A protein has these predicted regions:
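Acidic/His- and Gly-rich active-site-bordering loop/insert found
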Residues: 2-99
Length: 100
């Protein structure tokens, strides 16, 4: 398996973990912990404030411009028409399905 394939598999596993973890708005402490643990495992310095996780590039150079990547990790309550288990990441035909 190439390094790119390894990283792709790790990204899929992280996404599956996030999908499998309920994270309704204001209740995303478990997904915040999952993200922080993943970053720390990969040697990325990070801080957590409430459910927000802040990470700094380990190759940070103060003489260069900064780039902010921002995302949310909360979800809305699944509606009654949802046809799958919303908290079970499923891969079918090369596609990943789940709430999020």
């Amino acid at each position: 398996m190439s390094r790119i394939e390894e990283l792709q598999q790790e990204a899929i596993e992280l996404l599956q973990g996030l999908i499998n973890t309920p994270s309704l708005s204001s209740e995303e402490d478990q997904t915040a912990a999952l993200i922080k643990k993943w970053l720390e495992k990969h040697g990325v310095s990070c801080k957590q404030q409430r459910n927000n996780v802040y990470a700094i590039n380990k190759h940070e150079d103060p003489s260069k411009p900064y780039l902010l990547l921002n995302s949310h990790h909360d979800t809305v309550l699944p509606n009654s028409g949802y046809s799958r288990d919303p908290y079970k990441a499923a891969i079918e035909d090369g596609k990943l399905y789940g709430l999020g």
